[in-house]
Amino acid sequence: MMRIHGIYNMNCRFCFIDKSKKYNEILEETKYFYITPTLGSLVDGYILIISKRHINSMTLLNEEELNEYKYLINKYRNKFKNIYKKYPIIFEHGTTNLNSNFSASSVVHAHTHIINYNFYDEDNLIKNTKFKIINKLEEISKNKNYILYINQNNKKYISYEFPSISQYMRMCISKELNILNKYDWHDNYFENNINLTINKIKEIGELDEENYK
């Protein structure tokens, strides 16, 4: 078991990462984050950015952490473009307010999903989730639970009035993939996709730094 540095929670699966599990392999470690594959990899090309600090959402990052977070988003957008020939989508179920009835997160420790997927019917997703466009991450409220969605064109959306369903965005993807009964990562690991993701990210290695800016 490997404990994430800084503030942590003894009962949190992201504070104590079991490196003996393939799905917890550390693909990259930075000062403030880990990059890992994940259980429930609905597609080939699915990773998480996990905060080392035990915080409830990425809105609680300090300035230095936020800068590194944005760098990693750009870095892995471009890595996915090189590997899969298209940009990924990115989302976070931010649970800033634990007293709110609105939540879509299944693990209350800040983590962001990067997925090799583009929605077929994005207009319907935006309508049903009540997404609104934002210009930058700093605009997200620190007092409300939210879903952040960044599409393949790097357009950023936020919703504070989303359907309160655990793993909501995963459910939306699974529905389009016609595997709705397999959206829950607790029961469906997709080990082959995990292995493919690990191998392809390792194979491509580091890109030119200019690609990450």
Language-model region placement:
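HIT superfamily nucleotide-processing domains
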Residues: 1-213
